[in-house]
């Protein structure tokens, strides 16, 4: 889904997929006429998945860390009774890393077995994946405020209820870097932290 981009993204994606030999493996769903936000788009896309399919959250300005990421995830879900996974990601600063000696690893980390609740510091970040049926158990009203989908902190709105439902036996933290987070995009939430984001959380 293209959320009303203004930089020719839609045309580039459409043409790239149309000319690709495996274009039958990709569905280009829609270009929104009005921007509706990340969480609303995630909800919209999830309705197109079957219950046992695994949803992988990848933002358009980020990328998977390597070509075997989906194989890693497939192995996790195929060999254990896992309902959701999270982690791990690295910040991609491109050419303007403010501290070249800084650890690029993001905030994802294992949830203590006795702390599967939303009072614990949020560590369930990229790469986020989950079974569609688990996502469907989140009440729609819990993804909204005053009738509208949350515009910020959508990862909290999604992951807290799912990790509570999964518990330590069915949620898995993956230590290996699977995701590269574009840290130079001025529209990223971590650059927009302020009163609005605090209210959303």
Please give the residue ranges for each predicted region.
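Nucleotide-sugar donor-binding/catalytic module of glycosyltransferases
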Residues: 1-201
